[in-house]
């Protein structure tokens, strides 16, 4: 089942308003919603038969770097945008999968990405064949807050 254009627009808006270091907004998105594009993407990643995928890229030309050590925050910025899109997709009744196991060189080649763009992750989105999992599962599937805290 295709994802409705209105829902795609809401998901993209969630990425657009995501915060970024120094508000430089280095995240760039490649939206794939057709069979040809999904076939190209499947050469680099398992997209789980999703009807929609978003390649989340970081434009290194717009990177903010921490002065103390030069750490670029583009991966972080792209990840924040991805998380915002996932939460929006969930709120719209969609399922999503954050994919990091892919070949970035194949993605860059297949989609003609500019030299300064690095594909950070792929977000596959669609209607799940399975019912949504209960948030109650976090009580057993996630570490307790006490383990999460490094110092307390």
Predicted segments, located by residue:
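A short beta-loop-alpha structural element at the N-terminal edge
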Residues: 1-6
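Glycine/small-residue-rich phosphate/adenosyl-binding loop
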Residues: 7-81
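A glycine-rich helix N-cap at a beta->alpha junction
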Residues: 50-54, 112-134
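Short secondary-structure boundary segments
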Residues: 58, 101, 127
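C-terminal helix-cap and adjacent tail motif
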Residues: 69, 122-152
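Acidic, metal-associated active-site segment
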Residues: 81-90
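Structured binding elements
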Residues: 93
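Active-site helix/loop module of the DD-peptidase/beta-lactamase fold
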Residues: 99-116
């Amino acid at each position: 089942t295709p994802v409705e254009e209105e829902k795609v627009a809401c998901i993209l808006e969630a990425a657009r308003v995501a915060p970024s270091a120094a508000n430089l907004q280095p995240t760039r998105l490649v939206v794939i919603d057709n069979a040809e594009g999904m076939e190209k993407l499947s050469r680099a990643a398992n997209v789980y038969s999703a009807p929609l995928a978003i390649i989340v890229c970081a434009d290194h030309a717009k990177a903010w770097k921490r002065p103390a050590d030069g750490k670029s925050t583009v991966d972080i910025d792209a990840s924040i945008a991805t998380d915002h899109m996932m939460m929006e997709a969930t709120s719209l009744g969609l399922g999503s999968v954050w994919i990091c196991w892919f070949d970035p060189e194949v993605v860059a080649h297949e989609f003609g990405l500019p030299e300064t763009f690095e594909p950070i992750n792929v977000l596959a989105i669609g209607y799940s064949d399975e019912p949504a999992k209960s948030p109650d599962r976090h009580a057993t599937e996630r570490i307790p807050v006490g383990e999460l805290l490094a110092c307390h």
